[in-house]
Swiss-Prot record:
Protein name: BRCA2 and CDKN1A-interacting protein
Biased amino acid composition, Acidic residues: 25-57
Main location: nucleus
UniProt organism field: Mus musculus
Record GO terms (molecular function): kinase regulator activity
Free-text tissue specificity from the UniProt record: Expressed in the testes (at protein level).
UniProt key word Cytoplasm: yes
Cross-referenced Pfam families: BCCIP
GO cellular component: centriole; centrosome; cytosol; mitotic spindle pole; nuclear cyclin-dependent protein kinase holoenzyme complex; nucleoplasm
InterPro entries: BCP1_family
Domain of life: Eukaryota
Amino acid sequence: MASKAKKRAVGNGIQRPLGAPGQREEEEEEEDEVEDEEEDEDDSDEEEDEVDEIVDEEVNIEFEAYSISDNDYGGIKKLLQQLFLKAPVNTAELTNLLMQQNHIGSVIKQTDVSEDSDDEVDEDEIFGFISLLNLTERKGTQCAEQIKELVLSFCEKTCEQSMVEQLDKLLNDTSKPVGLLLSERFINVPPQIALPMHQQLQKELSEARRTNKPCGKCCFYLLISKTFMEAGKSSSRKRQDSLQQGALMFANAEEEFFYEKAILKFSYSVQGESDTRLGGRWSFDDVPMTPLRTVMVIPDDRMNEIMETLKDHLSV
């Protein structure tokens, strides 16, 4: 099924290692013969130097948003695995559900490049996506139940009983549907792209509500955000009440604004599950970071205010 362009997203530079390795100048050998072992060591040192000399350059890449299609299965599933890591969540089923309800949601792809460009572009490669799964409507599906069990289990481990009861009631109140908001992208895609993606999703949700389509009605949004904090600081139960927003860093910078408006929020560590191949290395300026997941619940009536805040900070 061909994807149709939905909305042009923000073009921006992302960091990519480019350029050929630097050439190391060889010193003239004073002796005619060199031991084999010494030659091997020199070769090894040369390879290390070449790796060190690779430089990062900023490449300007234009992105565009497309409606979700069958070709996006692998890319969406990979990004969901980046979010849930080793958690017992059926990401294959979740991906299929998101694709079935393609009246909402978008994927981010690179804008078509000219034929004379030297860049090799995979037209089906996605750099991110946004969508929503109505957990109340999808009650009984394996992935929806697993996600609810996941957040409740970590809430029990890290929060006071009153918050556990509040979250349990919220997730199981069928009269007030809860939507799982999913906004995932690779770590080097700039946050400015989030503004048109979220704006488009809100329009699609409003249209779904007007036409009585799935996902249209949500009273609350559940968001599981990739965050991290300086290693050594705790996200335990005692720490949750005093955990300041400033101590958290958000992989998706715009999700800090959702955090500010959340009526319920807590974090848990995924230190033993992190995969640097997908999410990048969790360190800044050589300061080790502990990868977390931050769960937050935002009422629907606060979403317009969040969208205005995103517009103020992310408009280009």
